Amino acid sequence: MIKTAALLLATFAAASVTQPARAQAAPVAALTKSPAACPALLKHSFKRLQDEAPQDLCQYAGKVVLVVNTASYCGYTKQYEGLEKIYSKYAGRGFVVLGFPSNDFNQESSNAKEIADLCFNTYGVKFPMFATTSVKGPQANPLHTSLIKLTGQEPKWNFNKYLIGRDGKVIEYFPSKVAPEDKQLTSKIEAAL
């Protein structure tokens, strides 16, 4: 029995020496499609509405992005429904809506839980929503500061929209009165996709 065990050990040792080294598996990152380079316009991080965890906008590089300033107590608040519809319709083709609640027009709650409840439970929003921020004037967040500079259009009310192409360049600005499902907006989204 001892001779058999010794023979097995010797055979195993010889086999491990004579076996050619196996090629190491390629790293997982090499097997997955690398994301598009992050354009300057998206090189920002914002806190998420639901939990205030930071979210890097570079994860949306290579997508068509619609940036919208939102509010809970506005005549345009029902646009959440249309925003969710176009998000659902086009998300599979590389489209995302980014919602930025703002109290710049005195129509947003100061309570993040109330805003989240309205968005996620009342309107069934699935697109990314961020913590309350300023979207105009000297206090505007860095994304909106860039959008204003690039378009010459500062939000004049809630639910203003900026459409950004896959290349990270602004395609067009849309005022509040342009509803999410309006052909004026959807035709631009479809052309960008």
Describe these PLM feature segments.
Residues A26-C58, K78:
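N-terminal "domain-start" segment that seeds a small globular fold
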Residues P142-L193:
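Thiol-/selenol-based redox modules, centered on thioredoxin-like
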Residues Y76-A140:
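Structural microenvironment flanking redox-active thiols in thiol-disulfide oxidoreductases
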